[in-house]
A protein has these predicted regions:
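Generic enzyme active-site microenvironment
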Residues: 42, 52, 143, 176-177
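PLP-dependent aminotransferase-class I/II
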Residues: 72-147
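Glycine-rich loop-to-alpha-helix module at the N-terminal edge of alpha/beta enzyme cores
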Residues: 1-66
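Glycine-rich, proline-tolerant flexible connector loops at the mouths of alpha/beta enzymes
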Residues: 146-155
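Short coil/turn connectors at secondary-structure junctions
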Residues: 7, 34-37, 60-64, 76, ...
Length: 179
């Protein structure tokens, strides 16, 4: 702590410093892409979510999003639109950002789809939404916590995230992991 305090009295993402560059380079080396990777370093998780939402709309030109029930993504207006872990987070701030539809998180402990493979059932539910209520061609991104925290510390079933990735790829939808 003493060594860090001697280097920085205050840090922000407004100006680059050696440690930020080293972190960005390390993240780029770990990223599983075959193309150059850029990092967006910011002050908080909610700010990173806001950045991801803006980038998704900008890149795709699409207005809608899908989030998961039970998720916590922050308390700024965009991220709050995805936060559905407790109503108290949104109380007094309605309406939040339009265009966000929530779907069930595949919860093995409180299954919403009795007798079904929860992961497959949720993917089928999203497909049904695409056909009936939320056209896939209008969805910029789907945002999920790979490990849902406030929603009960839930891991999705094996294969669910890969299935969600495939569904997004099929429709040109970005997939945002907020972890």
């Amino acid at each position: 702590v003493k060594d860090a305090a001697e280097q920085f009295l205050h840090i922000s993402s407004d100006y680059w410093h050696e440690n930020m560059v080293a972190l960005a380079e390390r993240l780029a080396a770990l990223a599983p892409m075959g193309e150059p990777v850029m990092s967006f370093l910011c002050q908080s998780g909610t700010e990173s979510v806001e950045g991801a939402l803006k980038l998704a709309r900008y890149v795709t030109g699409r207005p809608r999003f899908i989030g998961f029930l039970g998720g916590f993504h922050g308390r700024t207006m965009g991220s709050l639109s995805f936060t559905s872990s407790k109503y108290t987070q949104q109380k007094g701030f309605a309406p939040t950002m339009p265009g966000v539809t929530h779907v069930p998180y595949p919860n093995p402990y409180r299954p919403l789809f009795a007798g079904a493979d929860q992961g497959k059932a949720v993917l089928d539910y999203i497909r049904m939404l695409f056909e009936r209520n939320v056209p896939a061609s209008e969805v910029a991104a789907i945002m999920i916590e790979p490990l849902q925290g406030e929603g009960g510390y839930l891991w999705p079933p094996e294969g669910f995230l890969a299935g969600l990735r495939a569904l997004c790829d099929e429709h040109g939808i970005l997939l945002i992991f907020d972890e």
